[in-house]
Design a protein with these regions (language model features):
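Active-site-proximal alpha/beta segments of enzymes that process anionic O-linked groups
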Residues: 1-109, 116, 229
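Structural scaffold positions in well-ordered secondary structure
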Residues: 13, 81, 136, 154, ...
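Short beta-strand segments
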Residues: 22-24, 78-85, 126, 153-158, ...
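A long, amphipathic alpha-helix that forms part
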Residues: 61-71, 105-152
C-alpha cells in the first residue's frame, strides 16, 4: 500500500494538465494513501482541519470551494472529497439532522452482542448519513452556482457499508465479513450528456477507472493493460461476480454465495448470510483471477 506509486487515474490526469485537489475529513496516512494513490500530489493535506469528523468534513467542503475558486477560469480539475462523519457516526446536534429517533446517544462497542437492539444504533448512523448528504448537496449547489455542474462529472460512492447485525451473527460495523451489508455501497454518477439509467448488473469500484480513462481522458489502451475492472456501461461479457479484498483474506462475491480465499489458497463456501453454503463447486475463474492480480502486486 505504501509503494510510492500513485494510481493510474491520477497519473493520467496530471499528464493532461488537470488541477488536482484532495480534501478529506480524515487523515490520509491511515491507511497510507499519501504514499500510494495520492503519492506525488503537491500540497497534499495529510491531516484534516477541525476537531472531530463533523468539523473536518465541513472544512473539507469549505477548502474545496476556496481551492476551486482560486483556479483560472476554464481550468480542468479533479477533486476527491472524503467525508468521515458517517464512519464516525457523527452529526451536528441540530434538529435538521436529528431526524431518526430514538438514537444511541453514546456509542459503547462493549455493549454490542447478538441480542442487542440495533434500532437506536442504526438511527444514529442514518442521522450521520443525513449530515453527509447535506454536505454533498453543498458541493452540488456550489458547482451549479458557478455554472460548472453541466460540464463536471460527479461520482458519489462509499468505501464500504456498515452492518447492524443484519444476519444475526453478531457482526457490527465493517471489515468483519463480505456480506452485502458490509460491502455493498451506493454509486451515483452525474455525467453531463449521458441519458439517465439504472444499472442492475454487478459492478465494483474497480470499474470506475476503466470507465473514466477511455471516455474522459482518451485512453486507447486495452483495459487489461491498467485494470482488472471494466467499463460500468459495458454489460456484455461482464463477470457474474465481484472481487473484494480484506485484511486477512479475500472473497469472490457471487449472486447467491460468497467464496472466501485465504493467503494459503484455502477456500470456504458461504451463502449470502455468511452461513455454510451447500454449493461447494470450485469456481473455474479463480486461477485466472489470481494470476491476473499477481501482475499488479509485484
Amino acid at each position: 500500500p505504501s509503494s510510492g506509486t500513485p494510481g493510474i487515474l491520477l497519473i493520467a490526469l496530471q499528464k493532461r494538465g488537470y488541477e488536482i485537489g484532495i480534501f478529506a475529513g480524515a487523515p490520509l496516512n491511515m491507511p497510507e494513501f499519501h504514499k500510494s494513490i495520492f503519492a506525488g500530489i503537491s500540497n497534499l493535506p495529510i491531516y484534516p482541519r477541525g476537531k472531530g469528523a463533523v468539523d473536518s468534513d465541513a472544512f473539507a467542503v469549505e477548502d474545496f470551494e476556496k481551492w476551486q475558486s482560486s483556479l483560472k477560469p476554464g481550468s480542468r480539475f479533479f477533486s476527491f472529497i472524503f467525508f468521515d462523519s458517517v464512519h464516525a457516526y457523527s452529526f451536528p446536534k441540530e434538529s435538521k439532522y436529528e431526524v431518526f429517533k430514538p438514537y444511541w446517544g453514546s456509542i459503547n462497542h462493549m455493549e454490542l452482542n447478538n441480542s442487542f437492539d440495533p434500532a437506536p444504533y442504526l438511527a444514529r448512523y442514518k442521522n450521520s448519513v443525513r449530515y453527509a448528504d447535506n454536505l454533498i448537496q453543498k458541493v452540488l449547489d456550489y458547482l451549479e452556482e458557478k455554472h460548472l455542474l453541466d460540464e463536471t462529472i460527479v461520482v458519489i460512492s462509499s468505501d464500504h457499508g456498515d452492518e447492524f447485525n443484519d444476519n444475526k451473527l453478531n457482526f457490527w460495523g465493517h471489515g468483519g465479513n463480505f456480506t452485502d451489508a458490509q460491502i455493498k455501497v451506493p454509486l451515483v454518477i452525474h455525467w453531463p450528456g449521458k441519458k439517465p439509467a439504472n444499472i442492475e448488473y454487478m459492478t465494483s469500484h474497480l470499474d470506475l477507472v476503466p470507465t473514466l480513462l477511455p471516455e474522459v481522458l482518451g485512453c486507447e489502451n486495452p483495459t487489461e493493460d491498467y485494470s482488472v475492472g471494466m467499463s460500468i456501461w459495458k454489460e456484455a461479457g461482464r463477470r457474474n461476480w465481484v472481487y473484494s479484498k480484506g485484511w486477512s483474506r479475500d472473497a469472490f462475491v457471487e449472486p447467491n454465495r460468497i467464496v472466501l480465499i485465504n493467503a494459503a489458497g484455502a477456500l470456504e463456501f458461504l451463502d449470502k448470510t455468511y452461513r455454510p453454503s451447500k454449493d461447494k463447486t470450485i469456481p473455474a475463474y479463480i486461477p485466472e483471477v489470481l494470476k491476473e492480480n499477481s501482475r499488479y502486486l509485484k
